[in-house]
Amino acid sequence: MLKFFENLVDPYPPEPPLQPPKGVWRFCWHYCDGMKRYMLLLALTAGAFAAIEVMVFGFMGQLVDWLSVQNKATFLEDQASVLWTMGLTLLVVVPLVGLLNNLIRMQTLLPNLTMRVRWLAHRYLLQQSLEFYQDDFAGRIAAKVMQGSIAVRQVVSKLCDTFAYVVVGLISMLILLANTDWRMAVPIAVWLVLFSLILIYCLPRLGRIAQDQANKRAVMTGRVVDSYTNISTVKLFAHTKRETDYAKSSMNLFLVNVFQMMGLSTWMDVMVTSLNSLLIFATAAVDIYLWLNNSASLGMIAVSLALAIRLQGFSDWLMWEVHDFFESIGTVADAMNTISKPHQVIDHQDQPLRVTNGHISFSNIGFHYGKKTGVIDHLNLQIDAGEKVGIVGRSGAGKSTLVNLLLRFHDLESGQILIDNQDIKQVSQDSLRASIGVVTQDTSLLHRSVRENIVYGNPEATDEQLMQACKEAEASEFIEGLEDMQGNRGYMAQVGERGVKLSGGQRQRIAIARVLLKNAPILVLDEATSALDSEVEAAIQASLKRLMQGKTVIAIAHRLSTIAAMDRLVVIDEGKIIEQGSHQELLDFGGVYAKLWQHQTGGFIGLN
């Protein structure tokens, strides 16, 4: 039975995720698609449970009246049908309603909704641009997804379960008492109005504090994660105390916010406690007055007082439920600000890129990171199919930006990039990047096994292809000697977040093996050998030459000797091409390239 209710909702819908809407309610509703019928059923069972509970109070009052006036000899015979009905209600209906409510809430909605939010939000965020992740902490983004999903679950649960139970329960109480004498309902009605005023005054303030608290929690988490992620830098510069102070400042801001929330909650508790005492006093006073005037039976007086006492405990529970509700709303609002951001790079047409030759055309392109000028201005560059082109320039000249634009990590602000006469903006990002192999200076590795990291370039690769790629990248020898803390060896060893268990050169060789395995028709080498020593560079020279065969290659390097043998060298300065030609032609020209060459020696891609 549990499995049946667990499988009523698919937590992993296959449809492409849409941009979540702005606004807390619309944001939550967006993730409830396919669950709304069960949300309604949850509300109905919660309301039914509350109505039955009040009905039981009414029956107990009636029972008191019967026991005080009816004949013991004929009591069971006279009231048999009512007693049987109430017995069946208590022994059968109440457990069944409670069971259905729990199955819908605990098995169908809460686990599946939490995972559904995480699944859809994660898929949506994976399609965000590189700039989105560069502008925020990875830990902070992850915290928004994890905490936001729990908060959405809490909001939906309290709306459909808690508040449905409360609303139906309060209405049922008023109806029960008013049917006896409307004056018996007055204390509860007044209590309800005053309780609502307390909530109206306090809850918006709680909501604002909760949203601020969620943001400060994310900042605090981001700072802590940032320290852990860059622990080598922290230790290298002996800044442990600096990092603790940096984290402490965010913790203090969070703590101040917590004290604000707890202070407001304390005053709410004081006001509600005073109101509850007033309710019991007023209820007792009204009941005594009605009894003295023979307007209420002992049974209904017992019900009235019992309901007042029930409301006293009920109000404390409700106050904290509402407190949690608004805290969850604040968390949702904070998560929404990150998760609901529109994609900056969008697939306008889901057409695959078809690389037949590998011709690349940069046509009058411009990109300024949102500024008026700078970075790249009106750049034109044609790269023939199979041509090997080296990009040269000082730091900040725009070399890596040019590669990022080719990979469509950013959209052009002007101009056009074509691959085999196909505008890269009109093809899917996945197909574009699947056609380009990249080895960068900053090689990040997933926190998985060495094997998983390498076959990331080609998940369908065989073990033989994997071994061959590692051999060509001069990586097989050190991989076979790896062992992690769990005892995994060789290709099954976990390499750790960002490859912290490997040297820079080892990470670089794994990256080269990964691209060898990918075997894409276009190859980008962005400082691909910067982390390799001269001995290893020389060892993989032949491998890189084989890798470049039959491919269109764009290589970026500060060490000019590594790209001197390229078919053509392009010198970029301040986002514009100022020189291009072969190595010898540029030396003869005596320009920027010649000056840079004079300062450098060595290299692995020889001139012969």
Language-model-derived ranges and their functions:
Residues 136-139, 212-260, 332, 351:
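Loop segments that connect adjacent transmembrane helices in multi-pass transporters
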Residues 86-98, 192-196, 200, 265-286, ...:
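Hydrophobic alpha-helical segments in the permease module
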Residues 10-21, 52-61, 65-68, 90-138, ...:
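Juxtamembrane helix-loop junctions of ABC transporter transmembrane domains
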Residues 37-62, 105, 153-166, 188, ...:
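Alpha-helical segments in transporter systems
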Residues 1-53, 68-89, 101-110, 123, ...:
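Membrane-integrated ABC transporters
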Residues 239, 263, 280, 310-338:
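Cytosolic ends of transmembrane helices, especially the final helix of ABC transmembrane type-1 domains
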Residues 34, 38-51, 93-95, 161-212, ...:
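Transmembrane helices of ABC transporter permease
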Residues 348, 353-608:
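ABC-type nucleotide-binding domain
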